[in-house]
């Protein structure tokens, strides 16, 4: 059911936003400035997707989740307790971004099955954004060859 897929997306995106937001404030090291800005771009983009996702849930006649407990329950992404070093932040966001892509692909399939083209278009835009983050995060993590 598309509404359930969107709720999972909503919770997962919220967790992704919170994690990138925390990494933005807590990153340290020689690449601080660059990573601080990069994490900011990610969390701002994730935040911007929350409201439209909730509105599409309402459009389908369901209520959007509205509590931290419900977000945690719905999310495919685990919360962050400790503050990792910069490289581990990148590795974790890379893995979480792949989880976002999986959730988005499931939503896209549901939207197409239910002939909800407007929602499918929104999801396609999110897939494009997270596809870009995937190659950017992969590039940050690439080890130079000797």
Regions found by a protein language model. Give the residues of each.
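Alpha-helix capping/hinge segments and adjacent helical runs
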Residues: 12, 58-66, 96-99, 146
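Secondary-structure edge/capping motif, primarily at the C-terminal ends of alpha-helices
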Residues: 20-31, 107-115, 141-144
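Short, helix-capping/interhelical loops that line the mouth of catalytic, cofactor-
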Residues: 26, 33, 62-85
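Short, surface-exposed loop/turn segments at secondary-structure junctions
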Residues: 29-39, 117-120
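Conserved alpha-helical segments that form or flank metal/cofactor-binding pockets of metalloenzymes
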Residues: 34-70, 137-140
């Amino acid at each position: 059911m598309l509404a359930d897929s969107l709720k999972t997306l909503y919770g997962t995106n919220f967790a992704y936003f919170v994690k990138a937001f925390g990494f933005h404030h807590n990153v340290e090291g020689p690449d601080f400035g660059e990573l601080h800005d990069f994490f900011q771009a990610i969390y701002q983009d994730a935040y911007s997707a929350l409201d439209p996702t909730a509105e599409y849930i309402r459009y389908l006649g369901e209520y959007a989740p509205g509590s931290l407990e419900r977000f945690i329950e719905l999310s495919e992404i685990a919360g962050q307790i400790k503050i990792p070093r910069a490289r581990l932040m990148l590795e974790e966001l890379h893995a979480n971004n792949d989880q976002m892509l999986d959730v988005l692909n499931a939503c896209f399939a549901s939207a197409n099955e239910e002939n909800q083209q407007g929602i499918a278009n929104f999801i396609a835009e999110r897939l494009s954004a997270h596809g870009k983050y995937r190659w950017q995060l992969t590039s940050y993590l690439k080890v130079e060859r000797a």
